[in-house]
Amino acid sequence: MSLSPSLDSLCLRVQPLSEMAESRALVAVREALEASDARRTVWIALSGGLDSVMLARLAARAVKDCPRRLRLVHVHHGLQAANDDFEQLARRLASRLGLPLSVRHLALAETALKSRGLEAAAREGRLAALSACLAAGDSLWLAQHQDDQAETLLLNALRGSGGRGLAAMPPERALAVGGASPGRDQRAHERARLLRPLLGIPRHEILTLARQQGLQAGQDWCEDPSN
């Protein structure tokens, strides 16, 4: 009697990559839900791109097992015609998932553009618009993933940002209600929390999961023309 496992039995034991991707992502999202205050609202920043679309879908699925109040929030940058497409996709997804959606229109000040540059001004304006939705104790979820983490570290290194710039993005941090950075004397109950549930998940797994669900670029998520 041979003790060697057959090829068929080995195949049965191997979890398909798509299932592994789904399992890892769902575990990450459920952990983020458990870390969020059950009495408060979880806001998911929905840009309309692949990563935020999948984060919203995963959260809508996971919330059935870990009840939380979910809301989506989309920031319209008003910088290019494609921003209208992003907003329309966000509205369709919110309707499909049965989740409320808030849309914020961003107006970047000319002084901010000149002093900070377009990318930095848009990033800071977006975070301010998102955090303005929050009440104390709420959570704001961003869809940054493992590849974003690596890219951030590389860009900061190339810019010579120093020790602070080389620090990794934290999976979560305090966020002052209204968008200001929380001061040391600010009491905990006046803060919200920013979480990045997918920070440990590589982008290829997110894409694999989207394809497994039959989603398509241009139809179920928008590709950023500036990338």
Where are these regions (language model features)?
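Core alpha/beta nucleotide-donor-binding catalytic domains of modification enzymes
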Residues: 2-227
